[in-house]
Amino acid sequence: MTRTATPAMLTAPTLPQALRNGINAHAAAQLQVDIAPYPGMEEGDLIELFWNNCFAASRRITACRIGQPTRLRIPQSFVLDGPAHVHYQVMQIGHGPARSATTQVRVKTDCPGGQPPAVYSDENQNLAPVGLPETIRRQGVNSRQVHRGVPLTIEPYPNMSSGDAITLRWGDVRMDLPKVTAKGVGLTVQVWVPSSVIIEGGDDCRLEVTYCVLDRVGNNSRWAPTRTLRIAPLLPTRPATATPVYQPRPLG
């Protein structure tokens, strides 16, 4: 006889690959869901997993799995961009189905800069190289600019979104830029490369400058095509000339 009492709600499932409640393209391909052990767990229990209220997977509990977490996989065809609600229910003999609380996540599989065309390349041709003043592009960075710093720009890129984190690479030096804001989406990113970064990068006749983008759920753009610059050696600054002190001529 089936009991009619409503069982207590079970704990929500967890998604170990989620980053800030988001699912990226890599995770979506093999998305896993963990279900914690629950009170009264018995051999023969049937766990059914639901993605946006659609049945996605199930697992029958065996004797050796009692008291252990259960891991299920969501088919990739279910994992579409946008918000998703994940829950499960437990079916036990002689009991009504016990439902869990719901976990909410957001799926984002569109990478910053779009999908790179070459699988085996570290470069994304969908990203524009950094923009620099024409004189710097032609003549390089002179000693005065090394001391002062230089401006550059990053053009808007495909799938640009709020929360994107851009990392500039100046030679072997990396510089993290402020995250893209909602107002900044679709706009050119203005960057000032400070003297400290240029000096640390050192003088070079072919220094490479590039950048990459990591979105809020961990999708990576790969590196933009590089811009090659000549960096002049750092000239020492002139020491300040001491002000002469008046010395009165001795009498006699």
Q: What is the predicted function of each stretch?
A:
Residues 1-252:
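Intrinsically disordered, low-complexity linker/tail regions enriched in polar/charged residues
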